[in-house]
């Protein structure tokens, strides 16, 4: 069941769902609009062969940029972080979607789940499918998070728990 704004307000007022900072326009009809944080990550190299199964960490492949503007080159992508630190209830899952206005400029994100029990800034991959450079601004609403109740409760203990700022991918060396 997708949670409407009245249910979201209840979860926030009881402290079960935390969104910090919480702006007047964060809570929408059927989800939360989240803002671009103060840093993003892009690949530091071009033409490199990346083998995730051989990496313990991929952080060295990325350059973290602290800026008020996010520059996404043509047919490239950037890892963006939310300004908001989010703490999800253990019985609510989030489905991240790019705001449709930004999608109309040619930006897309892959299907992204914010797990029940997750806590941290949310890192999202934003792909520029166009032949043009697209520049976004820190603080603009970019992500719409739809929340839904789960049957039962979850204990999230993933590597990204508690992440602050933009977080490049982990390596998959121990999973392949």
UniProtKB/Swiss-Prot annotation:
User: Listed GO molecular functions?
Assistant: dCTP deaminase activity; nucleotide binding
- Catalyses which reaction(s): dCTP + H2O + H(+) = dUTP + NH4(+)
Q: Which Pfam families match?
A: DCD
Keyword Signal assigned to the entry: answer is no
* Metabolic or biological pathway, per its Swiss-Prot or TrEMBL entry: Pyrimidine metabolism; dUMP biosynthesis; dUMP from dCTP (dUTP route): step 1/2
InterPro entries per the UniProt record, alphabetical: dCTP_deaminase, dUTPase-like_sf, dUTPase_trimeric
UniProt-annotated catalytic positions: 125
> Translocase: present as a keyword of the record?
no
What is one Gene Ontology biological process annotated in the Swiss-Prot or TrEMBL record? dUTP biosynthetic process
What SUPFAM superfamilies is this protein classified in? dUTPase-like
List UniProt keywords, sorted A-Z.
Hydrolase, Nucleotide metabolism, Nucleotide-binding
Q: What is its EC number?
A: 3.5.4.13
Q: Give binding positions for dCTP.
A: 99-104, 115, 163
Q: What PANTHER family does UniProt report for this protein, alphabetically?
A: DCTP DEAMINASE
Into which family does the record put it?
Belongs to the dCTP deaminase family.
Subunit (UniProt): Homotrimer.
What's this protein's function? Answer: Catalyzes the deamination of dCTP to dUTP.
Q: What is this protein called?
A: dCTP deaminase
The scientific name of the source species is Pyrobaculum aerophilum (strain ATCC 51768 / DSM 7523 / JCM 9630 / CIP 104966 / NBRC 100827 / IM2)
Please state the gene responsible for encoding this protein: dcd
